[in-house]
């Protein structure tokens, strides 16, 4: 009984020691992510040529799942914003399709100024309307104040189809696109001109007369990735801890309108004015989101029925010239809505940014900058024509001033026809240029083809892109229109964040892996995707209990996204194969597959393939332990991020060791190997080995004897032994006669003669062989005896061990039987006593009543 208690105590101690240890556990399907710069792909509801060749059709999936977490957001340093800037530039280039160099046009041209068409009546009308901003002017009134575009008709000679024969050509150019020198001694108005930018860049002509359609796109995360969205009401482009976070698959639909200074057709207009600053405090990069309550719009128009004349210069080179013989009226833009009220609210918000209570809103002024035409003017594209609108009139209207924005030293000249530079107007004059500066790449010029017919664009104004100059606490504050195009995409996409889902996590548990040969089989995957991240804000313990469902959500989402994307790609493969965005869409699909395969390869290297919770044999050696009830997986992963490298290395080493152990275990568990011991062929192999050992030993012994014989032969004959022969007088007294006892001298002589006559070498060989045989026999006998003793001892120990096990089992059975017997007896006694109490209770009650009554 004592031995049994000792054994039970040892087992209990071992179990208690094993329970106290923590081991690394791998979890697959946890809602954790990290920032990513992967290429997103685009969807669009548009069906024009560009949309169908670059984006896949919109699936109208606006699913949004809220997350109970906090996350950092930044609008400008955002990979999604950088992608949008690059992609929209590609859209520009593909829409304009520059393909033919215009280097032949970079020659001297003889130009004559075109005649004007403005009448004195129009000039008088324009002069009488200078005193009011004309908020509700008609189209005729606005066009009456517009000046005429200065243009020239230029002729030049160039070799055409016949290289040795020059041909004269005639084209019409805007004067802003020419660099001219007046001729001396020539006809009046004639001048020598060159096309601008000939010396500093390569100009290209548009092959097709395409134009810029209103295009709306949305960016979508590839499979295995997601978009986080900040929904805080006080979000201003920078939030270290956004509290109202949700996860989406795609962004909202955004417009692709490119402008400078003023944002058009934005998708984030709300009933409040907001100021966004880069990094939360950068005054040079500011977005002012305008209140949609004021209904701010802008209407832009190019008057006249403009026509285009294709001029074939040589084979493969066609230049689209402007066909008119008189000057055209300037284009114009009319700003409509309550701009005064909107600008007043903007001024109040500018004061709140720095908490400048002493500054009057009258000291906050809107300004424009100087530099390239795209920077100094309100620049945008309207149906293929690039408008350059000088904002001085409108800025004077908002600031309630009448000054020349180009400098305070200049006087406002009101003597010239038309309005001067110091008037207030709700509309501005615009120039149209055919040669423009590229807004994305430095110094590159893109040629925009002219459009025929009437042009008009109506847009909503949703933002101002500015730089704020805080001079001092009480001084004037200048709000300067900024030409930074990236602010457009920071405004549109700044509340989104592209993240990569990392569904593999590590945490310590007290469960150690069972290292048996069985493995879990692959499970089927169904359900959706965004619900997978819905558990990001829940505690680790609650999330871990639903890992199977979450991992199914993850893979199902990946497969569904891949299926949708592949179907769209297959439908448009003929169109996608030649476009840059088509390649990016395919790249997004490949990236998702690579990511999923990489995750599965990592799990497989740790022995955790197709497992949602995988226990390991690697001990947890770190002090960090999770709080399963009040810590999210995202918080835990950020806490142990520095330990991931060490943990993965230990997991790989443990898996390699487990593979080796499993291989050995399978060999021991192989019954075919066990029955092979009873095979005669197996034993014949061992017999062969033993026979070879004996033959080798005998061969070595024979070689040793042979070597001894050769050595003796080389030494020569041995000398004869000197034997003393006794005489008859010295014959020993044997107490008898000659016939009784002793050896006669004649017999000794015979033996001596025999010995002397037998060769000594043969005797040595015989003796050596006899001695060797005796030694071998003795050695074999000793080995057999030792082996027999060992076998007897092992059998004895085995019998003793079996006897002890039998006694222990018998003792345990007796103890269990005795304990069961005692427990049963006690239980029976308790039941009997309870039964007696119930049976005897009436009698005891009766006896008690008799005692009381008696």
UniProtKB/Swiss-Prot annotation:
Domain statement: Some of the most genetically diverse regions of the viral genome are present in Env. They are called variable regions 1 through 5 (V1 through V5). The YXXL motif is involved in determining the exact site of viral release at the surface of infected mononuclear cells and promotes endocytosis.
One Pfam family this sequence matches: GP120
Motif (YXXL motif): 717-720
Annotated protein name in UniProt: Envelope glycoprotein gp160
Record's miscellaneous remark: This is an African green monkey isolate.
Region (V5): 473-481
Parts forming coiled coils: 633-672
Origin species: Simian immunodeficiency virus agm.grivet (isolate AGM gr-1)
GO biological process, one term: virion attachment to host cell
């Amino acid at each position: 009984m004592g031995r049994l208690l000792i054994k039970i105590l040892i087992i209990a101690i071992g179990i208690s020691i094993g329970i106290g240890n923590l081991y690394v556990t791998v979890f697959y399907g946890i809602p954790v992510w990290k920032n990513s710069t992967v290429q997103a792909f685009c969807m669009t509801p548009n069906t024009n040529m560009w949309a169908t060749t670059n984006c896949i059709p919109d699936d109208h999936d606006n699913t949004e799942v809220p997350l109970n977490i906090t996350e950092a957001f930044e609008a400008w340093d955002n990979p999604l914003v950088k992608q949008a800037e690059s992609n929209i530039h590609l859209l520009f280039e593909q829409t304009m399709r520059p393909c033919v160099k215009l280097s032949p046009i970079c020659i001297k041209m003889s130009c004559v100024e075109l005649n004007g068409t403005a009448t004195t009546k129009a000039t008088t009308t324009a002069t009488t309307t200078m005193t009011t901003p004309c908020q509700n002017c008609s189209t005729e009134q606005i066009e009456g104040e517009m000046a005429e575009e200065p243009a020239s008709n230029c002729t030049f000679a160039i070799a055409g189809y016949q290289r040795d024969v020059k041909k004269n050509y005639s084209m019409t150019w805007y004067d802003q696109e020419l660099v001219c020198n007046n001729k001396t001694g020539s006809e009046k108005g004639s001048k020598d001109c060159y096309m601008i930018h000939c010396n500093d860049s390569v100009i290209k002509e548009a092959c097709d007369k395409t134009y810029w359609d209103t295009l709306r796109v949305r960016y979508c995360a590839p499979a295995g990735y997601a978009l986080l969205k900040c929904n805080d009401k006080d979000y201003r482009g920078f939030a270290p801890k956004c509290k109202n976070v949700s996860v989406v698959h795609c962004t909202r639909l955004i417009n692709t309108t490119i402008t400078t200074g003023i944002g058009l057709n934005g998708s984030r207009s709300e009933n409040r004015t907001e100021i966004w600053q880069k990094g939360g405090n950068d005054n040079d990069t500011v977005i002012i989101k305008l209140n949609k309550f004021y209904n701010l719009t802008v209407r832009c128009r190019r008057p006249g029925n403009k026509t285009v004349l294709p001029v074939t210069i040589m084979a493969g080179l066609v230049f689209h010239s402007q066909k008119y013989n008189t000057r055209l009226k300037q284009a114009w833009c009319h700003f409509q809505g309550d701009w005064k009220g909107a600008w007043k609210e903007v001024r109040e918000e500018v004061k709140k940014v720095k908490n400048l209570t002493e500054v009057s809103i009258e000291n906050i002024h809107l300004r424009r900058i100087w530099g390239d035409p795209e920077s100094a003017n309100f620049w945008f594209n309207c149906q293929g024509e690039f408008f350059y609108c000088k904002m001085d009139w409108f800025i004077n209207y908002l600031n309630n001033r009448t000054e020349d924005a180009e400098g305070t030293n200049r006087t406002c000249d009101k003597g010239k026809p038309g309005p001067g530079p110091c008037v207030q107007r709700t509309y501005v004059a615009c120039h149209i240029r055919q040669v423009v500066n590229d807004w994305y790449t430095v110094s590159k010029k893109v040629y925009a083809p002219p459009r025929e017919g009437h042009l008009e664009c109506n847009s909503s104004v949703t933002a101002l892109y500015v730089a704020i100059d805080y001079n001092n606490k009480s001084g004037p504050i200048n709000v300067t229109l900024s030409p930074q195009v990236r602010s457009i995409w920071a405004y549109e996409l700044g509340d989104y964040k592209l993240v990569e889902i990392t569904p593999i996590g590590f945490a310590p548990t007290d469960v150690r892996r069972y290292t048996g040969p069985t493995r879990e089989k692959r499970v089927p995957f169904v359900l959706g995707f965004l619900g997978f991240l819905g558990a990001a804000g829940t505690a680790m313990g609650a999330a871990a209990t639903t890992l199977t469902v979450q991992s199914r959500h993850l893979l199902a989402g990946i497969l569904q996204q891949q299926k949708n994307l592949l179907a769209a790609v297959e439908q448009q493969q003929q169109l996608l194969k030649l476009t840059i965005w088509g390649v990016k869409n395919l790249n997004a699909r490949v990236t998702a597959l690579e990511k999923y395969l990489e995750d599965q390869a990592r799990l497989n290297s740790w022995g955790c393939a197709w497992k949602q919770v995988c226990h390991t044999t690697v001990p947890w050696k770190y002090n960090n332990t999770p709080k399963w009830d009040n810590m999210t997986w995202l918080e835990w992963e950020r806490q142990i991020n520095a330990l991931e490298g060490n943990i993965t290395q230990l997991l790989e080493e443990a898996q390699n060791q487990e593979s080796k152990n499993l291989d050995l275990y399978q060999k021991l568990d192989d019954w075919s190997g066990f029955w092979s011991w009873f095979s005669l062929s197996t034993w014949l192999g061992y017999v062969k080995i033993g026979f070879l050992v004996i033959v080798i030993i005998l061969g070595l012994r024979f070689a040793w004897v042979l070597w001894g014989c050769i050595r003796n032969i080389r030494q020569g004959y041995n000398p004869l032994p000197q034997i003393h022969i006794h005489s008859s007088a010295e014959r020993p007294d044997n107490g008898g006669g000659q016939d009784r006892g002793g050896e006669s001298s004649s017999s000794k002589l015979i033996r001596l003669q025999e010995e002397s006559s037998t060769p000594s070498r043969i005797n040595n060989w015989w003796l050596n062989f006899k001695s060797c045989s005796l030694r071998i026999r003795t050695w074999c006998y000793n080995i057999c005896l030792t082996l027999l003793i060992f076998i007897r001892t092992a059998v004895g120990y085995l019998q003793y061990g079996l006897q002890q096990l039998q006694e222990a089992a018998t003792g345990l059975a007796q103890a269990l039987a005795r304990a069961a017997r005692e427990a049963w007896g006690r239980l029976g006694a308790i039941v009997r006593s309870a039964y007696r109490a119930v049976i005897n209770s009436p009698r005891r009650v009766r006896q008690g009543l008799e005692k009381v009554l008696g």
